[in-house]
Amino acid sequence: MSAKLINNSGTFGCIYHPGIPCNPNETVGPEYATKIHSNTNQSIVLNEIAISNKIKENIPDYADYFSPVLDACKVNLANVDAGNCKFIKNKTSVQFVSTKMKFIKGHALLKHVKQLTNMKAYKEVATLYDKICLAVEKLNQIHVVHFDLKSDNIIVTKSGTPIIIDFGISMDMDNVIASIDKGSVSKNASVSKLSLSNISMINPSVSRKSESSLSAFPPLLDYSFYTYNTDYSTWCVDIILISFIVQKQKPMDIITSTQIMNIFDEVMRKNNFANKKYLKDAVVLYRVNFKLNVADKFNNVENVKLLNHLITKYRKWDIYSATILFIKMLEQIKQFPSDAHKEIIIHNLGFVE
């Protein structure tokens, strides 16, 4: 069976099934898919392998929740049918990296939910949310943040099991926190545990900045919090604030409560939280508490002090993203949350402690 392109929408690669073999004399079984990456995405590939290793080594039942990278190798352009994969079709690279993973037959989360038409739709959506939150808790236990928990990165199987995929921009928080304490640390420290002999052309460097350590954040922070964007609903206020500090500021620059609250208000507005009746009062209270406990507390202090405070809350980041998805799922089936779920939503969005 020849491999066919099944997803060309990814920013960093195209997915083929049953896959592209590392050795042209071999075949890849239908239980696997492969993602073909451009050689320009070196750090993304190595990072996904490193995170995948940590998941496989520390979560015994990982296959029930995640589809991490199982193997990786170089592939030759001659062995790849470009299809509609733009970066292959345009030949922006002559060498490509293939990452092998379990093939998950199903639909992206919101597409799956859109097809629910029976009276049990609410119960099914609530169950999906519970399962996603359980998966997030398993990542939290090993200090990993997925960081891109959106609909396309959760595939729901025919049996109704959500499987989380794509760990390309995920974070090993042990390394991130260590990088703040000790300076730059390789995000890919555990990569050596998976054989990379066939993809030796990859350079694991994650630094984009050349400034001295006195004027710039550690390269790992620059890599992890790679963009400041208040439009991305998957990210909570804490992440967006950290991204603002890392991308727009320097460690010893002074940040003000006005700057902090302006970012807070923009995020609330762009997420349209205040127009959701069941969240309106909670948003008002959240703003009061955020101003008191964050903006006023860290008014006129060095950026690095606020960053150190926010980074410790990383266990809430993916739960926030999962809750945003829960809200979107409820909107898909045109239902409001029950009173019990309202309280859970408000808590998991971080609107109350």
Question: How would you label these PLM feature ranges?
Answer:
Residues 140-157:
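Catalytic-loop of the protein kinase fold
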Residues 162-163, 167-334:
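C-lobe/activation-segment region of protein kinase-like
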Residues 135-139:
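Conserved hydrophobic alpha-helix
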Residues 342-353:
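Conserved C-terminal C-lobe helix
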